[in-house]
Amino acid sequence: MEIGQYQPNLEGDGLRIGIVQSRFNEPVCNGLADACVEELERLGVSGEDVLLVSVPGALEIPLALQKLAESGQFDALIALGAVIRGETYHFELVSNESGAGITRIGLDFNLPIANAVLTTENDKQAVARMTEKGRDAARVAVEMANLTMALDQLGDDEDEEEDEEDEEERA
């Protein structure tokens, strides 16, 4: 049996990307952002097609993502942050709530969001992961933007066929 298959597309030319970066644990978040923006550029995304906004912490990321999504100006969004375990339950709360909010915004707005909010046990782990996770976020955003646009066209093709059939019936 032969099946149709979509190949991953990492071509970023013409894509509009919004980035929301937390300022809490700022050195790690800056490292994430630097790696992410560098990778977006490597993938062909123009600097003029990228908007980076910062928020105080990880819990504020979903609201900023929602505002960017509402604008309708982006093909994909990226969430960057670092939640590092402390001595209280707050780590779990921030990790779970920010992650759930990020996922909800993507689903509510039918918009890909690359979640690169690191959740680590300590600073050393966060620093060790920031560069590769920043790059990963850029690749995820570009790939998923291209995938969602390709999948959106599936419905357009069916609509065009139905329109042609309707026109033939009327003729």
Curated annotation (Swiss-Prot):
Keywords: Riboflavin biosynthesis, Transferase
Binding residues for 5-amino-6-(D-ribitylamino)uracil: 24, 58-60, 82-84, 115
Pfam families xrefs: DMRL_synthase
Presence of keyword Transferase: yes
Origin: domain of life: Bacteria
Residue span of region Disordered: 150-171
A molecular function GO annotation: 6,7-dimethyl-8-ribityllumazine synthase activity
GO biological process: riboflavin biosynthetic process
UniProt binding sites for (2S)-2-hydroxy-3-oxobutyl phosphate: 87-88, 129
Enzyme Commission number, as recorded: 2.5.1.78
EC main group: transferase
Reactions this protein catalyses: (2S)-2-hydroxy-3-oxobutyl phosphate + 5-amino-6-(D-ribitylamino)uracil = 6,7-dimethyl-8-(1-D-ribityl)lumazine + phosphate + 2 H2O + H(+)
Active site: 90 (proton donor)
Pathway involvement of the protein, from the record: Cofactor biosynthesis; riboflavin biosynthesis; riboflavin from 2-hydroxy-3-oxobutyl phosphate and 5-amino-6-(D-ribitylamino)uracil: step 1/2
Biased composition (Acidic residues): 154-171
Family matches, as InterPro entries: LS (IPR034964), LS/RS (IPR002180), LS/RS_sf (IPR036467)
One GO location term (cellular component): cytosol
Protein's job: Catalyzes the formation of 6,7-dimethyl-8-ribityllumazine by condensation of 5-amino-6-(D-ribitylamino)uracil with 3,4-dihydroxy-2-butanone 4-phosphate. This is the penultimate step in the biosynthesis of riboflavin.
Family membership noted in the UniProt record: Belongs to the DMRL synthase family.
Protein name listed in UniProt: 6,7-dimethyl-8-ribityllumazine synthase
Lineage: Bacteria, Pseudomonadati, Pseudomonadota, Betaproteobacteria, Burkholderiales
